[in-house]
Every structure is written in C-alpha cells, then in structure tokens.
Amino acid sequence: MIFYTADLHFHYEPFLPSRPFGSVEEMDRVLIARWNAAVSEDDTVYVVGDVGYNRGLVPGDALARLRGHKHLIRGNHDTGFENAGELYRYFETVTDFNEIDDGEVHIILCHYPILYRRRGYMIHGHLHQARGPEYGMLRQMPRVLNAGVDVNFYRPVTLPQLIENNRAFYSGENDALIPPPPPPPPRGGGSVTAGCRAGRISAPFRPGLILIRSDL
C-alpha cells in the first residue's frame, strides 16, 4: 500500500503553538506512533518534504523508528542539514520531484504546490494549514492535494484518505480540529529548488510559494 505525508518537522519547537502538543517530545512521540499504527514494513511512504529543521541535523533517531519503504521529496527544510548525507540512510530515494503511479492513478510529487488540472493528482506539502491567498486558489483545484500532517491528523494517509481530508479542510468542515498555522519563517531563508518535468525551478523562499507550470 502507498501512503503520503509531509511537514513532520521532527524536533522543531517553533511549530508547537500551531500543533496540539505540549512539548517537542510529545509531538515526536505521537508522529512516530501514528505513522507506525498506519504503516507496515511492506508499505511505501512518500514524504513530500520537511522532515526536520533546515539548520539542524537530520532527525535520524526519529526516522530510524518509522516503518515502511520511505522516499523523500525534499522540501526547503531538507536541503541545509549539517549532515545532509545521512538522509540516504533512512530513505531509499531522495529527490526534489517525483512522478509515480498509485494503482491506475498518476501522481506528481513536489514539496511546493503546482497548479495542476490534468489527469491524476499533484501532491504537495509546505503550506501546513495556512489560510492565505493560496488557500482560496487551491480550494478550486481538487486535483492538488496537501499531504501535510497538520491537515491529515498527524499520520501518513492513502490517496483516498488524502482526497477526503483535503475536501474537509478546504470546505471548512475540520476547522475546529485544526489549530492556527505556524508563524512565518525567519527572514532571509536562502533559496529553495524544486525539480519539474521540463527542467528545474529555483526561487527565493517565501511563505505560500506556488510553482506555476503550463506543461503539467
């Protein structure tokens, strides 16, 4: 079975005010427990970016405890680890972009949302539970799905679960269950790079970054 998730941010305290946990230790413990309750060793999990915090170390102690065959599509918090090579110990592949088939459904995977209206689905992270200008745009695009743990009950989910959770998020049905979004990142966060089918895109990081591709 194939699962999707994003924006775990293990060990990252600044996100606590926007999550229902009293400490980083509790957050990490719940994320690991819910992952392993859903995923078996034979399952495949695509992590669509941001396993930790860009200026720290790879959270290997947490990643080593997660079940399944894991694949990372890097986000802006996965490119600046002091020991970035350690990611390859915990993930079978580490890429900036990926395309797969989930059964008969074609899937595009990128940390940053791509405006997409064609066959299959585009699965992203990065936005957490943000309600900025991108929210109104993406709620009109049901083929663009947010895999972030903040809108998926802090666990990896299958494609049908992801579709339903996004429907509930964009309809406002789950508003009472989702805390406010995290604070904006520090200024001057460097750059982010995402791969796309017709080449690569490089842009300065800013909250709510959306990649617009006419060829997808």
Residues covered by each model-derived region:
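N-terminal active-site segment of His-dependent metallophosphoesterases
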Residues: 1-59, 143, 147-152, 165, ...
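Active-site neighborhood of phospho(di)ester-bond hydrolases with catalytic His/Asp-centered motifs
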Residues: 5-6, 46-50, 70-76, 109-110, ...
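Metal-dependent catalytic neighborhoods of phosphoester/phosphodiester hydrolases
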Residues: 49-65, 79-90, 119, 133-136
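A short, structured active-site edge motif that brings together acidic residues
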Residues: 71-81, 95-100
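Conserved beta-sheet core of the metallophosphoesterase superfamily
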Residues: 87-175
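A cross-taxon signal for low-complexity, glycine/charged-rich
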Residues: 188-191, 206-208
